[in-house]
Swiss-Prot record:
Belongs to the TrpF family. It comes from Streptococcus pneumoniae (strain ATCC 700669 / Spain 23F-1). It catalyses: N-(5-phospho-beta-D-ribosyl)anthranilate = 1-(2-carboxyphenylamino)-1-deoxy-D-ribulose 5-phosphate. The keyword Secreted does not apply. This is N-(5'-phosphoribosyl)anthranilate isomerase.
Length: 199
């Protein structure tokens, strides 16, 4: 069954909703954005997450030192990196890694040392999707996540199109920039039970 990552969580209530609804991954954004949390805030929220739900830290062009500090302080299970990725960034990390790839039309999939790939729109976190026809996942070495403009109305179609390891949502479960608990529940239900949206 396709796994679900709910990203950009910053409140106790949103974390508890995502966990109780069946999220497999909870994402904390450490890069500058409206969803950014500090390591200290994430460490407190992480206490609400059971061991079978994985904690993911989201970074943009981080140093290895930044990753190691966050892994240690928050107890991250995975790191997700956007932007520049140094050749040795993922080597011998104490947790798993995800490399984000912005799908911009050239069809290029990098040769990555990460454990997973995540395919996203050109502007991550914008709520915009990418042209699914521009991405060929045939023969990928790693399991992959699909992100970029997913919501309760299109996520089942995305799963049918790509058969991904997991789907990732942030703005698609928000209302006016804040996580909407009912949208979180409905999104996860659509993924887990294959209920198509109305649009």
């Amino acid at each position: 069954m396709t796994k679900v990552k709910i990203c950009g969580l910053s409140t106790k209530e949103a974390v508890e909703t995502a966990v109780s609804a069946g999220a497999d991954y909870i994402g904390f954004v450490f890069a500058p954005s409206k969803r950014q949390v500090t390591l200290e805030e994430a460490a407190e929220l992480a206490k609400l997450i059971p061991a079978d739900v994985k904690k993911v830290g989201v970074f943009v062009s981080p140093s290895r030192v930044e990753l190691l500090e966050a892994i240690d302080k928050v107890g991250l299970d995975l790191v997700q990196v956007h932007g520049q990725v140094a050749a040795d960034l993922f080597e011998n990390l104490p947790c798993a890694s995800i490399q984000a790839v912005q799908v911009d039309g050239n069809g290029h999939v990098p040769n990555s040392q990460a454990d997973y790939l995540l395919f996203d729109a050109p502007v991550a976190g914008s709520g915009q999707s990418f042209d699914w026809g521009q991405l060929d996942t045939t023969g990928l070495a790693q399991p992959f996540f699909i992100a970029g403009g997913l919501n309760e109305d299109n996520v089942v179609k995305a799963i049918q199109h790509f058969t991904p390891y997991a789907v990732d949502v942030s703005s698609g479960v928000e209302t006016d920039g804040q996580k909407n608990h009912e949208k979180i529940r409905r999104f996860i239900e659509r993924v887990k039970h294959g209920i198509s949206g109305t649009k």
